[in-house]
Each structure stands twice: as structure tokens, then as C-alpha cells.
């Protein structure tokens, strides 16, 4: 049995975690096994790498160091959580995955796409999301939401130019592969965003059981 791999992407403050939990609840109501997870993180070791990546530090982190740590955490996460859950037939709902690496380390940091693609192939093999939900939001709104949550992590402290590049990379990737991506307007009221998720449910269930 093979499950379904769904990733949720978007900039800071876009509501990915809230909507991931909502989608999980709706799927579980229909008797579907759901594996909730996130990146970077998802296993104890990967969560320790997450701490390194997010904690502000007096020592600047080189962009390639950041990239390699992301994929180190991802390798552990895939082996320990994602592949086993898919093998059980579960729906994996993952808050960020490799699209975030293209957006943040590629778009934001300016690292070559080919470098990211090489690591993607090495670490993931043929594993790719079945569906990616991109929660799109104007940068200023996302940053205001992130600031309202309290202390900012290392990424949230980046400037507007960084996040504009992140947003545009997400939208470009979605436009290049519309069969895999669904872009949702995260600036709408939460109830409207979640109504959009409800409309996706029949297709998700058909793909899972089809």
C-alpha cells in the first residue's frame, strides 16, 4: 500500500501549521491515517538540526552550511518518518519540504538551483510530493504576523528583499508544475482558506484510494 505525500509551503506567517492541522482533522474524520510532520525536523535528530538552523547566532552561517544542514535533517526525516508512513498507506502532511529549500536557500540566499537539485536527487531518490499547497501572502502581512508571535528566529530576521525572493520562487515553481501545486490566498479570512481546503478533499481521497 502506498500513501499520499502532501506538503504545505509558503512564507512566514502564512498559516501553514494551522491549516495542516485543519486538513488532518478533516481527513481523520473520514477514517484516513494521517502523519503530521515538519521540516526542518520531524525526528529527534532532525529537530536538533532545526535548532541549529533557526537559532540566532553571533557567528554568521554560510549559505552552503545552511543548505547541507537542511538536507542532513531531510535525509533523517525521510528515513525515519516519511517513507515508513507512506509505506503504511498514510497521508503525510508535511509543513515545508524541498520547495522551501529552493525558495529560501535558492531564492533568498541565491544558491544555484542545480546545486539544490543535485542534493535533492541524492537525498530523496524518487521521492517527491504528490501535492504541494502553497499558501501565498504579501510579504508585509506575513512579517507582521510573524512579529506578533514574539521573538523572531534566524530566518524571520531577514529583510524584505529576502522574503520577496522567497515568495516569487514559490510562485514560479507553482506556475511551472500546476499539476502538482495548488496556490491558496493566505491573505483571505481563515474560514475562506479552510473552505478552499475542504474543496480539495474529494480529490485527495480519490488519489489515496484510487
From Swiss-Prot:
The keyword Kinase applies. It catalyses: dTMP + ATP = dTDP + ADP. One of its GO terms (biological process) is dTTP biosynthetic process. InterPro entries: P-loop_NTPase (IPR027417), Thymidylate_kin-like_dom (IPR039430), Thymidylate_kinase (IPR018094). It holds the Pfam family Thymidylate_kin. PANTHER family: THYMIDYLATE KINASE, UMP-CMP KINASE 2, MITOCHONDRIAL. This is Thymidylate kinase. It comes from Pseudomonas paraeruginosa (strain DSM 24068 / PA7).
Amino acid at each position: 500500500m502506498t500513501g499520499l505525500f502532501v506538503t504545505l509551503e509558503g512564507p512566514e506567517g502564512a498559516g501553514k501549521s494551522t491549516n495542516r492541522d485543519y486538513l488532518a482533522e478533516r481527513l481523520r474524520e473520514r477514517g484516513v491515517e494521517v502523519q503530521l510532520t515538519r521540516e526542518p525536523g520531524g525526528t529527534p535528530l532532525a529537530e536538533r538540526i532545526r535548532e541549529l538552523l533557526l537559532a540566532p547566532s553571533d557567528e554568521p552561517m554560510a549559505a552552503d552550511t545552511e543548505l547541507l544542514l537542511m538536507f542532513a535533517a531531510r535525509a533523517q526525516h525521510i528515513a525515519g518518518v516519511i517513507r515508513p508512513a507512506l509505506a503504511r498507506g498514510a497521508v503525510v502532511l508535511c509543513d515545508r519540504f524541498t520547495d522551501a529549500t529552493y525558495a529560501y536557500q535558492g531564492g533568498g540566499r541565491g544558491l544555484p538551483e542545480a546545486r539544490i537539485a543535485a542534493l535533492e536527487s541524492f537525498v530523496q531518490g524518487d521521492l517527491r510530493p504528490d501535492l504541494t499547497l502553497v499558501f501565498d501572502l504579501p510579504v508585509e502581512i506575513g512579517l507582521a504576523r510573524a512579529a506578533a508571535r514574539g521573538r523572531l528566529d534566524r530566518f524571520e530576521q531577514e529583510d524584505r528583499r529576502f522574503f520577496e525572493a522567497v515568495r516569487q520562487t514559490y510562485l514560479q515553481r507553482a506556475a511551472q508544475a500546476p499539476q502538482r501545486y495548488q496556490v491558496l490566498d493566505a491573505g483571505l479570512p481563515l474560514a475562506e482558506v479552510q473552505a478552499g481546503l475542504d474543496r480539495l478533499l474529494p480529490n485527495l481521497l480519490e488519489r489515496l484510494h484510487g
